[in-house]
Amino acid sequence: MAQTLNRSLTDLGALLHLVDPTLPIGGFNHSNGLETFVQQRVVESKATLEEYVQTQLLQNWIYNDGAYLSLAFDAMCEGNFDRLCELDWQLSATKVARESREGSFKLGVRLLKIFIRYETHTLLTAYQQAIAEKRVQGYFPIVFAMVAQAMGLSKADTLYAFYYNAAVGVITNGVKLIPLSQMDGQDILFDLRGSLVQAVELSLDPDEEWLGAATLANDIRAMQHEVLYTRLYMS
């Protein structure tokens, strides 16, 4: 009983560390197109911010970052390094907005730099070497999956933590940009609980035919962000 409890708490601690908002990777610098939506007054209220997050979660992330995370987790379980590299290349091709693409691999490289100090795994070492040799970019969802699997976390817990972390980031940025009250942000996060579970269920065994399906409006806003006259975020 005590051994099971200790393992459960150890896993929880590892998961909380992985999604710690104070990790020095620079995630708070990126809005991934949200800033453009706010400047264009498409997202301008609590209701429209919640709609935006729901759309991102269930119409974008589950076919993009979440799906790639799920597949990378499987590749780690199988010890398939070539598959991890292939997923990195595919994800690079689907991230059409330059700022979002660069932001993702910068976060991934920094995340790997932190956790490779604590997790000794041959695939983490090989992947870091491949990044150094510019054979892969090191995208955030792939690194997130690799680190989580190396820690011994479950895929479902990893997906939930990833989606929760992404949703919190969008809500935090939206509250700041629109602006909204902090309580509005908490209300949106509370209302997302069911959708987060749904996203995990849809991502456990992703259909590879749907990889890269995205919200075109978000891709366009992410590209437009490059030429905004004033901006707070890097993407």
From Swiss-Prot:
Transmembrane segments: none annotated. One of its GO terms (molecular function) is nickel cation binding. HAMAP family: UreF. Keywords: Chaperone, Cytoplasm, Nickel insertion. Required for maturation of urease via the functional incorporation of the urease nickel metallocenter. UreD, UreF and UreG form a complex that acts as a GTP-hydrolysis-dependent molecular chaperone, activating the urease apoprotein by helping to assemble the nickel containing metallocenter of UreC. The UreE protein probably delivers the nickel. It comes from the Bacteria. The gene is ureF. One of its GO terms (cellular component) is cytoplasm. This is Urease accessory protein UreF. InterPro entries: UreF, UreF_sf. It is found in: Cytoplasm. Belongs to the UreF family. Its main location: cytoplasm. It comes from Haemophilus influenzae (strain ATCC 51907 / DSM 11121 / KW20 / Rd).
